[in-house]
Structure formats: C-alpha cells, structure tokens
Design a protein with these regions (language model features):
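Active-site acidic/histidine proton-transfer and metal-coordination neighborhood
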Residues: 1-89, 98
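Histidine-acidic metal/acid-base catalytic patches
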Residues: 7, 13, 68-186
Length: 186
C-alpha cells in the first residue's frame, strides 16, 4: 500500500505522504503489542524508504489515536532509527491534547516535523471524554504552539483539519479567520 501511495504521490507531484501504524487493538482487546507494531511498521518503512528517496516523497508518520507512539520521545526515537531525511513526521496539534501538550511535542520533535495539522480539542472534566472542536474553541495553547513552531524554525505547511458541514456555507471563512488569529500569535 505504501509503494502504491508513493507512485500516486509522484504522479501528483506530492512531496509527502501521511502514514500511521495499525491500531494496537480495538476497545479492550489487544490485537498487536507495542513491540510487534514497532517492528512491523519499521520493517515496512525500511523496505520503501529507498523508493521514497528516489521519488523524492517524504514518508511522515502522524500521531493518531492508535495507541502507538503516545509521547514525543517515542515518536522521536521511531523517526530517528531510520537516519533518513525521507522519513520525518506529520504532527497533529489536536491529537495529543488527551495525553500531552502540543508545544512539548513540537519542541521535542523539532526539525523532524515535515507537516502540521491544526485541530483544536476541548478537554472535559474528570471521567468525561473530551472532543474535537472548531479552532480557537478548545484548550490548545495556540500561543505556545506558535512560539514552539517559531523556536524550531518550522516553515512548512500548516493545514486545518476540520469536519466540513455543507449546512454552514461560511464555515471556511470562519476557519480562515481563526487561522489568521493563530498565525498572528507568533
């Protein structure tokens, strides 16, 4: 699947592919252990890094809710094991809010960050799950995020990850205005 994605990305002149490992499990049932997932994902990536390098397409694992690479130290170690500029990371700001701090992830990952998703997350009271919300409506410390991105000299794409609602025709205007506010915080 990754080889096919590289081929498609090359045809589209796409410079990067977002990737993530299989989920460790579903609900309370463990399907793959952390070490097995690490080993299998690492092996799969080692096989395709030469193809990605030849195609000039970066492979960027993203921090997603799959119960794998749950800290910036784990993500950094995972990326660093390859010693390749063709494997970096796609960082999602909102995805870490349940178990970490985006600004800490940014400072820890530094130059390994190739792409960034902007998404907000509202933490809830104890025992109640949080939820993804519109930009600037959650608990992300956007000033801290922007300061961290500046500190690590990030100059790549910042793309909002939003749920499109056709019933709200002005939604993209609101997202654009929110992005302008966030970007002005640096």
């Amino acid at each position: 699947a990754i080889r096919k994605a590289i081929t498609i990305a090359t045809g589209l002149h796409c410079e990067a592919i977002l990737l993530y490992a299989v989920r460790l499990g579903s609900g309370p049932k463990l399907e793959y252990g952390s070490q097995e997932t690490w080993d299998r994902f690492s092996a799969a990536l080692r096989e395709v890094i030469p193809m990605a390098a030849q195609a000039k397409v970066r492979l960027n694992p993203e921090n997603v809710w799959n119960k794998f690479l749950l800290s910036p130290l784990e993500m950094r170690a995972f990326v660093d094991q390859f010693h390749s500029p063709w494997l970096q990371t796609h960082f999602d700001v909102g995805n870490v809010m349940q178990y970490g701090y985006p600004e800490d992830w940014i400072l820890t990952l530094g130059s390994r960050i190739q792409r960034v998703h902007f998404k907000d997350y509202k933490l809830s009271n104890r025992g109640v799950a949080g939820q993804f919300v519109d930009l600037l409506q959650g608990d992300v410390n956007w000033k801290g995020v922007m300061d961290a991105l500046v500190k690590v000299r990030y100059n790549g794409f910042l793309s909002p990850e939003i749920d499109h609602d056709p019933a709200q025709p002005d939604q993209l205007k609101v997202v654009s205005a929110s992005l302008d506010k966030i970007l002005s915080m640096s």
